[in-house]
Amino acid sequence: MSDPEDKPSRLHAGRIDGGSNDDNGLIGAPADFVRGALADRDPLPGTTGFAGFLAEAPIDDGTEPALVRDVLGRQPLFIDRGVEPGGTANDRLPRWSTDPTDLADPKPLPAGAVLTPGATMPWWSLPSPEPAAPSAAQAAVDRALRGVVGDLRASPTDDVAVAFSGGVDSGVVAAALPRAPCYVAGFEGCHDIAAAREAAAAMDRDLRIVEITHDDLRRAIPAVAAATGRRNAMDLNIAIPLFLVAEAAAADGFDRLAVGQGADELFGGYSKVVEPATDHRVEADTVRGARDETVATLPVQLERDVVALRAAGIEPLAPLLDDRLVAAALELPGELLATPAERKVALRCAAAEYVPAGVAAADKKAVQYGTYVSREIDRLARRNGFKRRMDDHVGRYIDSLCRESMMDDHSL
């Protein structure tokens, strides 16, 4: 652990104004590793994501400076739409950063893309393998999870805390980090705190509860909106509990927060993938097709979640988005993804090696509902005169808080 006041820059060498021709500014993987993935066009080369600047990226038959972002967008990268490139290797590219607030007019580099001085090119795409036989598919998930857990257990993790809600995703992450304290956020009496208490007791883990108040919401709403550039209620309902957990862990001196992001998307955790042919929320009519639709939403979600966590002063660690688990998940047949009786079938089976049966089988509410954050933001909106009969009453309340925060900032 380190003093939260002494944290390194979140840019991770991600310059936005220059750098010498032989400099690289990457987060998530070494430059040589990313060059190899570029040369081979390998979308899953064995990382948990990467993004940044390469001075000499192997593009087609030559090398040139480039910005890159991995195939799932696990490391967000933003470019400035409003600044013309310059003339040196780095300056021939747009201004860029891993933090959108560094830029005047940020937009995300698409997941799997390479941006050179001449073009933005889709470089990597996710594999679309045929489903493996059930026994082989389950064995592949078991092996992948065993490798991820083993690597984490063998790594220095004194600076890591775990975001913990008592479900199978955070349970497996916590099991891979046996000495890390677990943090859960929510309003008094909420599902997530109750589930986390039960799971932590079953796993004999140190659980630290971040009890959210209305004052916390009034403070966090403009902070998260400013950090992410998003003011819609759904994004804030999801990001605020993460932000408040991360703040608490950072205040306790932790540098990294391990999260369960990606499990629902990869392994069939959403109700809409169970019977997609009759569910209007997806276009696909098969479980695998519906799962693929949810995987495609990950880059946009991670642009929100990763940025919100970093704004709280902590670096996210998402072991369930490891390439090994991604590759194994993509080969799962529908019956090991979701059925009317159970979702995330293969992941729960693999997790049984690491967590108690009750944790492996636990149902989990979406974070915005399990923490009561969505309910309580709605309550605050109505108390402040934004009634449900109004169009987008919660969105209007959020806008009012953001305007007040900006006025307060300008008066300082």
Task: Locate each region found by the language model.
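Short linear motifs in intrinsically disordered/low-complexity regions
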Residues: R81, P100, E265, K364, ...
